[in-house]
Amino acid sequence: DAQKDAAISGWSMSGYDPKNWKPASQIELASTAFLDKNLDYGQLKITGQLDDRVQVRKVLQAQSIQEPRKGVFIYDMGQNMVGFPKIFIPNGKAGQVITLRYAELLYPDLAEYASQKGMIMLENFRAALAQDIYVLKGGDEYIQPRFTFHGYRYLEITGLAQAPALAQVAGIVLSSISEISSSYDTSDPMVNKLWNNITWSMRGNFLSIPTDTPARNERMGWSGDINV
C-alpha cells in the first residue's frame, strides 16, 4: 500500500518524531513438526547469511500487449525471465488497487479452452499464488515489487482503465550469477540455441542458492540432484 509511504516519510533522519508508531507485538514461539520444543527469543541468535547476492542482470522491455477481456491487459516480455516488473503509472488515482499476475504460458487456441482464449495459464504453477497487489498513492509512480521474484513471460495487469504503454512496462531480470565461465559454439544453430536456453535457465535458478524452479510452488533450495 503506497499510501502508507507518507506515514514514514523521513523516518531515517534525525529529529523524526515516531509518536504515531505502535510498538511491535511479541508472538509466542510454538513448537513445530521440525522442532519439538518451545523456545523463547533469548535462545535465538541472528546470524548473517553468507551467499552470492542477487543482482539485476538485465532489463527486458515488453514486446506486445493484448486485451483478451475488458480491463485485462497482458504483456509479453518476449521470453521467460526471473525477476519482477517495473511499471510506470502516470497520473494514478490514490487508493486505486492494481493486481499483477504472472504466467509462463497463455491458454492455447483450442476448443476446450475457448472461454479462456488469450488469458494467462496458471495450471502449471500448481498452488503458487503468482500475484502482487499494489495500492497507488496517487500521481506519477512506479510499481516495482520488493522482496519477491517471479518466473514468467506474461504479465497480466488489472485495475487500470487504460493499459500502460509498452515503453512503460519493463522486466527486471535477477540472478546471483554474474558471468558464465564457459562457452559452447557449434555449426548447428539449434544446438547453440539449446546451450543459450540452458545457461539462461541456470541463471534464473541461482538466487543466492541453487533453486529447483522460480515459478511454481516449489521455489526451494536444489542442492542434491543438481550435483549428481
Where are these predicted regions, by residue range?
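Extracellular/oxidizing-compartment recognition motifs
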Residues: 1-217, 221-225
